Amino acid sequence: MMKKIYKKNQLLEVNNIPSEVIESIRETIGVLNENYGENRDIEADLGGYVLIAENIVDIEILKQDKLQGLIPEYTDIIECSEGVNWTSSLFLLSSDFAIVVVTTEELSKFLLE
């Protein structure tokens, strides 16, 4: 199941994800909060959020819904000491609203195809 993260304290509820990925998400949330406000209405205000996609079903739902027809502005590889690398892909839905999809490197191949 996808996890939508837009506040740093939500990271306390995230399990089974490498610490390097958590830190990357924390940095992204920090930038969004600094520029758009920590208490923004995530659905109505500008800014955006991070989505953690944990399986192929999550990826397919994203591609058919919010990310339909979009290609990422960029994708960064998050190198993890535990062996499985993750990626962070920035999708701009408008000039002031972004979704950053964080997923394993293997699943990102489906996200980017």
Language-model segments: which ranges?
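Short, extreme N-terminal segment that most often corresponds to the first beta-strand
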Residues: M1-I22, T103-E106
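Membrane-topology and secretion signals of cell-surface/extracellular proteins
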Residues: V21-I29
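Acidic, low-complexity, intrinsically disordered interaction modules
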Residues: Y36-L107
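Short acidic DE-rich linear segments
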Residues: L111-E113
